C-alpha cells in the first residue's frame, strides 16, 4: 500500500531538513522525500499548512501506573501522546509504589507492550521510595530497560547521595534527570518571586532556589563524569549556569515544560 503526503513542511533536524516537500510511504516505510512527487498512491493527504516530522519524543511524562490510574494510565496517556505527534514517551517514577526496582520496571514495560498507542520508556527512581536516603537499584533497573533515573517531584537533598548516584550511573551510561530546586529556599512558594507575586499576595519562589540546585548538580556531574538532565528549567540564572557548564564540557542537558 502506498500513501502520499503532499505539500507539508517537512522538518527533520537530523537531516538538516526544513522545507515544503512530499513524502511517499510504501508498506509502512518511507520510500521518498522530495518536491513534487507524482507517483500514484492508494491514499493521498494534503498537508498544506501542516508540519510533518519524525515522531516526537517526550522525555518527561506521567503515565501514573502503577497506583495512580485515576489521574492517568498508559492507554489514555499514550493516546493523547499519539494524537499530538509524540511516538515515544518516558514515564516518571513518582507512582505508588515508586518505580525503584527492576520488577516494577519490567511490569510497566510489559503493560505497555500489551496496551499502548506509543512507545513507552521507563525512568527509574534515584533513591528508594524517592526518599533521598538510600540509592535505588539503578543497575538492575538499567538492565531491565530503564532509560534514566529521577526522583521526580523531589530534590535529591543529600549532596553525598547525589554524588554516589552520579559516580555509580556512569557505568550504565544513563542520565540523572533532576528536579533541581532547593525546597528550603522555595519554601511554600507558588510562583516566581517578583513584582507580580508581591502585588497579588501569592508567596513567591526565589530564583536562587533553582540556581543553587542547578549549580550543585552541574559541579557534581563534572566531578563524577555523569550526564545530568535538568528538568523543567524556569530561571534565567539556571540557563546561564547550564550554558557555562556546557562550555566547560560538562555533560548537562535540560528541558522546559510546554
Cite the ranges covered by each PLM segment:
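N-terminal metal-binding scaffold of metallo-dependent hydrolase/deaminase domains
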Residues: 1-39
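Divalent metal-coordination and catalytic microenvironments
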Residues: 8, 23, 28, 49, ...
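Active-site metal-binding motif and surrounding structural segment of the metallo-beta-lactamase
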Residues: 37-52
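Metal-associated gating/positioning segment near the N- to mid-region
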Residues: 50-115
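Active-site mouth loops of central-metabolism enzymes
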Residues: 59-72, 95, 121-134, 201-207
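Structural motif
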Residues: 66, 92, 123-125, 152, ...
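Short, acidic/polar
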Residues: 70-78, 130-140, 216
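Histidine/acidic residue-rich metal-binding segments in metalloenzymes
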Residues: 134-258
Amino acid at each position: 500500500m502506498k500513501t502520499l503526503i503532499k505539500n507539508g513542511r517537512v522538518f527533520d533536524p537530523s537531516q538538516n531538513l526544513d522545507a515544503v516537500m512530499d513524502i511517499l510511504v510504501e508498506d509502512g516505510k518511507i520510500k521518498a522525500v522530495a518536491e513534487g512527487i507524482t507517483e500514484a498512491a492508494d491514499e493521498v493527504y494534503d498537508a498544506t499548512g501542516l508540519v510533518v516530522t519524525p515522531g516526537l519524543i517526550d522525555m518527561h511524562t506521567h503515565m501514573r501506573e502503577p497506583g495512580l490510574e485515576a489521574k492517568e494510565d498508559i492507554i489514555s496517556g499514550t493516546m493523547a501522546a499519539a494524537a499530538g505527534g509524540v511516538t515515544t514517551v518516558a514515564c516518571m517514577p513518582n507512582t505508588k509504589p515508586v518505580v525503584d526496582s527492576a520488577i516494577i520496571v519490567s511490569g510497566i514495560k510489559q503493560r505497555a507492550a500489551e496496551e499502548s498507542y506509543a512507545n513507552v520508556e521507563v525512568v527509574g527512581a534515584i533513591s528508594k521510595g524517592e526518599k533521598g536516603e538510600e540509592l535505588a537499584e539503578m543497575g538492575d533497573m538499567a538492565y531491565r530497560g530503564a532509560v534514566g533515573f529521577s526522583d521526580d517531584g523531589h530534590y535529591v537533598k543529600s549532596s553525598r547521595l547525589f554524588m554516589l548516584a552520579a559516580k555509580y550511573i556512569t557505568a550504565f551510561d544513563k542520565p540523572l534527570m533532576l528536579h533541581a530546586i532547593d525546597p528550603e529556599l522555595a519554601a511554600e512558594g507558588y510562583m516566581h518571586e517578583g513584582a507580580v507575586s508581591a502585588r497579588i499576595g501569592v508567596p513567591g519562589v526565589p530564583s536562587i532556589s533553582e540556581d543553587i540546585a542547578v549549580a550543585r548538580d552541574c559541579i557534581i556531574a563534572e566531578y563524577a563524569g555523569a550526564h545530568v538532565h535538568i528538568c523543567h528549567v524556569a530561571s534565567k540564572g539556571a540557563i546561564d549556569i547550564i550554558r557555562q557548564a556546557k562550555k566547560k564540557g560538562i555533560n548537562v542537558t535540560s528541558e522546559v515544560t510546554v
